[in-house]
Swiss-Prot record:
Job description of the protein: Binds to 23S rRNA. Forms part of two intersubunit bridges in the 70S ribosome.
Protein name per Swiss-Prot or TrEMBL: Large ribosomal subunit protein uL14
GO molecular function, one term: large ribosomal subunit rRNA binding
Family: Belongs to the universal ribosomal protein uL14 family.
Keyword Ribosomal protein: yes
GO CC terms, sorted: cytosolic large ribosomal subunit
Gene Ontology biological process: translation
One Pfam match: Ribosomal_L14
Alphabetically ordered keywords of this record: Ribonucleoprotein, Ribosomal protein, RNA-binding, rRNA-binding
Signal peptide feature range: none
InterPro entries: Ribosomal_uL14, Ribosomal_uL14_bac-type, Ribosomal_uL14_CS, Ribosomal_uL14_sf
Organism of origin: Actinobacillus succinogenes (strain ATCC 55618 / DSM 22257 / CCUG 43843 / 130Z)
Length: 123
């Protein structure tokens, strides 16, 4: 459950280390984002010579949450932290060329197959 002002780790090599959610996209008064949802973020901490810099406002897809995701068989997959993958504002494709850490099968939609293929582990 990601809401406005939530700090997230970045699970790709775009150059950002820490980002903050500034808006949950998809609905006029939507409060929370879960795994697979797109959010608007601002970069709070970045490494030198990265593809993004501090202060950039971009889109991102949530790939891991502490709240987790419930499967139809009743199992729940939770993670130790909240993480996202930064997307291009126009094409909504990942900016980075590598994904760090596991991602869930819920991302397996037409939009995010690139993230699934780059991820080292799909749960």
């Amino acid at each position: 459950m990601i809401q406005e002002q939530t700090m997230l780790d970045v699970a790709d090599n775009s150059g950002a280390r820490s980002v903050m959610c500034i808006k949950v996209l998809g609905g006029s008064h939507r409060r929370y984002a879960a795994i697979g949802d797109i959010i608007k973020i601002t970069v709070k901490e970045a490494i030198p010579r990265g593809k993004v810099k501090k202060g950039d406002v971009l889109k991102a897809v949530v790939v891991r949450t502490k709240k987790g995701v419930r499967r139809p068989d009743g199992s729940v997959i939770r993670f130790d932290g909240n993480a996202c993958v930064i997307l291009n504002n126009n094409t909504e494709q990942p900016i980075g060329t590598r994904i760090f850490g596991p991602v869930t099968r819920e991302l397996r939609s037409e939009k995010f197959m690139k993230i699934i293929s780059l991820a080292p582990e799909v749960l």
